[in-house]
Amino acid sequence: MGDIMRPIPFEELLTRIFDEYQQQRSIFGIPEQQFYSPVKGKTVSVFGETCATPVGPAAGPHTQLAQNIVTSWLTGGRFIELKTVQILDRLELEKPCIDAEDECFNTEWSTEFTLLKAWDEYLKAWFALHLLEAMFQPSDSGKSFIFNMSVGYNLEGIKQPPMQQFIDNMMDASDHPKFAQYRDTLNKLLQDDAFLARHGLQEKRESLQALPARIPTSMVHGVTLSTMHGCPPHEIEAICRYMLEEKGLNTFVKLNPTLLGYARVREILDVCGFGYIGLKEESFDHDLKLTQALEMLERLMALAKEKSLGFGVKLTNTLGTINNKGALPGEEMYMSGRALFPLSINVAAVLSRAFDGKLPISYSGGASQLTIRDIFDTGIRPITMATDLLKPGGYLRLSACMRELEGSDAWGLDHVDVERLNRLAADALTMEYTQKHWKPEERIEVAEDLPLTDCYVAPCVTACAIKQDIPEYIRLLGEHRYADALELIYQRNALPAITGHICDHQCQYNCTRLDYDSALNIRELKKVALEKGWDEYKQRWHKPAGSGSRHPVAVIGAGPAGLAAGYFLARAGHPVTLFEREANAGGVVKNIIPQFRIPAELIQHDIDFVAAHGVKFEYGCSPDLTIEQLKNQGFHYVLIATGTDKNSGVKLAGDNQNVWKSLPFLREYNKGTALKLGKHVVVVGAGNTAMDCARAALRVPGVEKATIVYRRSLQEMPAWREEYEEALHDGVEFRFLNNPERFDADGTLTLRVMSLGEPDEKGRRRPVETNETVTLLVDSLITAIGEQQDTEALNAMGVPLDKNGWPDVDHNGETRLTDVFMIGDVQRGPSSIVAAVGTARRATDAILSRENIRSHQNDKYWNNVNPAEIYQRKGDISITLVNSDDRDAFVAQEAARCLECNYVCSKCVDVCPNRANVSIAVPGFQNRFQTLHLDAYCNECGNCAQFCPWNGKPYKDKITVFSLAQDFDNSSNPGFLVEDCRVRVRLNNQSWVLNIDSKGQFNNVPPELNDMCRIISHVHQHHHYLLGRVEV
């Protein structure tokens, strides 16, 4: 029910593992081809125990359930740090408890199970791993993995009988009846010849049947001590002594990043761009100090040596922070992940210098594929992870980390290389990965509700104004099918040369790779398709045959929207004429956008190809052209694409006349007019046009300085981030929270200093005047605000306007006048080029539908996608990226990075530590795979909701498989519960009881349940292991 996890009985666990393996060649969603096989001959030793890999899951969400531990092992984790236990084992935690959007915050502590249940989960996993290892990776040298116990939080609690029983049973379970029970269960399974034959294990029969007797009764020889933030030094030392002296356990003690002191921690976070993370200085006052730690560690190392045991430190604990995000409950939350790395690695350097590299370090602070090689090469081991495994790719990131380590020459190091660690600690403060800007702030999202079925979607496509087939054309490029890729692009994009240069690429802000490393350079790939595919595409292209039955179309305006409309309609056989008042086509792209942003020949390329489709151009047309005139000339459809060619300007006091409006200025600049602007130019506004004006002004002879003045802050600035960065690169200066009031003849520009108030209707904080002013000495002023339609001209043209003076149009851009459409910026104000093309597509789609032309998009099926191939990419992070200058290497790299999310998404499956979301192939749906939620496995941590691109929560909104009647009754999720020959079903808060036969077939299914019952039948027939028993 909800956040109550239900453990899987051991026998059922084995059934789940091997039935899924037989059915799907996967275990807990990990495909067989991605089971990690350690490199032979490379091992590490941790206090005398051998480990085939130095990596594994940290004590946390990935080691709470048996299936989590199994999944960690399958993907390369061999040092398994079990989730922390404590005497208070019946705490109720508020949910959600994890926020892993970037750096991770959590509000969870120890295991959510009782001590007995936690021990039982670890025991199940202990047996399961021995079996899996014997089946898939047999070895004569014994087990390849280490279980490490994690306990907390004070000595009094640890000495309580339940904790003593837990620790003792972890150290030796020989007298516990569960150990004998599970050994008998395993023995029975391995004596079953049918089981061995089904999985091709007959040749291993002898060794497998001897396995149960060989499984050690001691699960752990080591412990990691976890103490609360603020635990007194004497208490920490006392617990360590107890573990060494009384329990005889090799011991790691977990220390806090607060050892660096408040000032240093604050400095590091601020330098790396994480200044918004709130800290309480008094928390540092209560924590262990460095001098105290050094003295304590020296005493404990001596004690361990005396007892012939191992002792070291676990670095580091999470960092206690103020809960100022509002995503999690409570006043405090605990930070981990990449923001923790520079802190933890600097703690490691401080301690290693003090102990000359002889202090063993178990590491966990911000380890990832981008840092693990550097950490390992210093001699630090083992290395455990939690935050990185909560990101898309999930457990597969462990495998990726191991592949990074396979080539290391540091496997034989038996101490910490202090010099190397010092260099890493210094580098950690400046490396890209630890800087906040490394991950853009944009959230990958689809602005629609999460559907019950068919939820696989490529967010790059949904973000695109023309819904370009991005994953498909990237795959074609990767296969060197450049002309095919370009043909696919042309299906939806009339202007690939233009949009290959100046598209606002919303696709890249919604690329799933942002949750891994960086977005694909999609716009550059479009450019490559045109460069490499054009010649072949043009050879096989045929001019569309015009049809005498098609109605003629007039388009007023030959800018991007007009060109696109002409292309789409002419391609479908319509006679199209574009009427343009200028002497050329291209509109704002040709005449306003500076040519340093896009070469003129590329603009002409798109114009020429539109003309090649038979589109006619009439230049120098009267601005007084009306809809009625065009209708009288025989045009059935009229599309208006006149753009936004008016500037409202800025009202200023003063008598300086050296004031330009942005559009006239850029038009004159593009003509090559000899402009006299003086030395210092100020541009008012902070949109893309303002960036163009400032960059253009700097290229005018005599101009030495260009300053953009904006009345809001950087965060509210409407310009695309890319345009802002280009302006900075060119040397443009910025003055935020300044608003011009007066421009005097002597060049004095008076600016009112502003502050930010409450958000406006667009979510931007309103600028509020202060009593302060500043002055600048300025030669010319350019106003780049208030671009809008010429509503007077529209009214004269005969366009109906609404009460606010905007064109009154429907979703397709059609006005109240039948067959008259508004497209491009004139429809709703200035936007991007691709958005203008998008409005043209919607209008032309409506026209073609009205003309009974089914579609102007080819139905050719471009990709026979192999999901296994895509899944291979899921755990990988690109350590280095090649430059786009090397076209072949760049295309190969980006094609390999594309996750093709509309074919294989399953992010909610990846990121769930408990494996509570599953993807199964179900025939008869649009998507090959459907996502189900397993109620029994879920604790509602909220992580799947964080990374799902839809507006929704998979653990609440997807079809839920219930295992217990009480959980079904206490939930509102859509889902089902199979009870022998009947199924209880819930959808939209309505419930049904249906009969199901032994073959999984229903009778009399209500129409609204067709999809759900098809899935239920498929699960019943092919994935019955998902319906297995659970413990109450």
Curated annotation (Swiss-Prot):
Ranges of residues in domain 4Fe-4S ferredoxin-type: 928-958
Gene encoding the protein: ygfK
Protein name as catalogued: Putative oxidoreductase YgfK
InterPro entries reported in the protein's UniProt record: 4Fe4S_Fe-S-bd, 4Fe4S_Fe_S_CS, DPD_II, FAD/NAD-bd_sf, FAD/NAD-binding_dom, Helical_ferredxn, Se_rdtase_YgfK
Cofactor binding note from Swiss-Prot or TrEMBL: Binds 1 [4Fe-4S] cluster.
GO MF annotations, alphabetized: 4 iron, 4 sulfur cluster binding; iron ion binding; oxidoreductase activity
Cysteine pairings via disulfide bonds: none
Cofactor: [4Fe-4S] cluster
One Pfam family, short name: Fer4_20
Keyword set includes Endoplasmic reticulum: no
Knockout or disruption consequences: Insertion mutant is unable to reduce selenate to selenium.
